[in-house]
Amino acid sequence: MGGLVEDMLMLARLDEQRPIERGPVDLLSLAADAVQDARIVAPSRTIDLTVGAGVAFLVLGDEARLRQVISNLMTNALTHTPNGSPITVRVFAGQQQGKPPVPCAVLEVTDHGPGLTPEQASRVFERFYRADQARGRRTGGSGLGLAIVEALVTAHDGTVSVDTAPGQGATFRITLPLAPDALAVEPAAD
């Protein structure tokens, strides 16, 4: 119950358009942490991280809130992907629409769950919406996780979308503008 109240309070703060704290955040590092956390929670699951080359995935934002975005997407994928099916997290460079286009970091979380109908996909970011009401009751989902993702990504001047079809799983994609100096920084070699 406490988590639900916290989620509702966060959405209320975002509705009031309170500014978020912005500092340099390494999106790749957050993604790697989320994958590692998911592997600990679900050690029998295959969870892969793939990374595009060419830029440091440095964005300006609130690290704790961006960590929550990725955590919500990972929790959603773990909840809806059957055992034995992989989950893939990809981080790569892209461009947001605009004039001129804005260089951005793209993070995708792909699951192999039941997928969504077009009507469900159009509503999946609504507050309290659950595509599968029975599953929500079983897993205890509030229907706020993806609404929080959308609100937080929007507050970071980013976009969120879903590509899905029934029986085909889903890919949730967030794009966040790169920090001005991200293009000049080469990512660290592992």
Tell where the protein language model's regions lie, with residue ranges.
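Short beta-strand/loop element within the Bergerat-fold HATPase_c
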Residues: G84-V102
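Conserved catalytic submotifs in the C-terminal HATPase_c
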Residues: G23-P24, D48-F57, F92-G94
